Amino acid sequence: MIKRYLITLILLCTAGTVLYTHYQTYTNNPWTRDGQVSAYVISITPRVTGQVTQVYVVDNSKVKKGDLLFEIDPSTYVASYHKALANQKQATALLAKAQNEEQRARKLEKRTHGAVPALTLSNLHNAVQTAQANFELAKANIEEAQLNLDFTKVYAPTDGYITNLNVRVGSQVVANSPVVALIDENSFWIEGYFKETDLAGIAPSDRATVTLLMHDDVALEGKIKSIGFGIAKKDGITGNDLLPTVNPNFQWIRLAQRIPVKVTLNEMPKDLQLRVGMTASIKIIKH
């Protein structure tokens, strides 16, 4: 009987020790399975309206900064550019004419005082200023027409991955309306949600270990980039405050809120590709 009690006591002590060790490990190194891979997503938006004539990429392809993505029919913008050039020539001629008329009148007035009324000289001077303004406006119109012509070619603003490509040859695109997303290749991070009670003693630059659900046998080393300073309230009026909304797991009991923590990886294995939205687990190593 005593032997049985001793065995039970030993088992209870062992279980208690294991539980205490795990608790201490979790307290010193909090972890969460509620993590996701994130990255900056750039909306590729044409600056001009028109019909797409060429598409040089396919969905989910990799591109380099400066790669040509697609072209918009330039016909209208070529015509506008030539029209702006013609208007500048006309404005140049009118400016030269106004300047010559003013110069002749002033020379005549200089030779014979009173030969040209003061009002006429004033009107001629105003005509020159108006012609000069029209000339500057014509120059600006040329610059605008040239920009619009350049905007018919849409380039990748950074290295990254094309996703959600919704444009084809013949599609009509509208200025300032996104047509494709570009995931910035150099902006990946892991975002995990930790209970507020787990963040005591956690600081930016603390080390972290990340495990992806897709590659749970590979531990990725990283460090904390930032800790969220606010989340949106679940209930109540918050307005358009742009704070992240983190829904609690349970509604019927009072639980610690979850705060977003961003982790950047120190190095990526060459055979491992991060994708936005992948599930991840994060373990923080306190200093």
Where are each of the predicted segments found?
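Elongated periplasmic alpha-helical coiled-coil
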Residues: Y40, R47-V48, V78, R104, ...
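A structural signal for short beta-strand/turn segments enriched in small hydrophobics and glycine
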Residues: V52, N60-L69, A138, A145, ...
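Membrane-entry signal-anchor segments at the cytosolic-membrane interface
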Residues: M1-L11
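Aromatic-capped interface at the extracytoplasmic side
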Residues: I7, T14-V37
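Extended amphipathic alpha-helical segments
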Residues: N28-P30, A79, K83-A86, Q90-E101, ...
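Hydrophobic alpha-helical membrane-insertion signals
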Residues: N166-R168, V179, E185-H287
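Long, amphipathic coiled-coil "stalk"/hairpin helices in large membrane-associated assemblies
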Residues: P30-N87, F151, N164-R168, K195-T197, ...
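Short hydrophobic beta/alpha edge segments that flank linear recognition/processing sites
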Residues: K64-K83, E143-N148, V173-G192, N240, ...
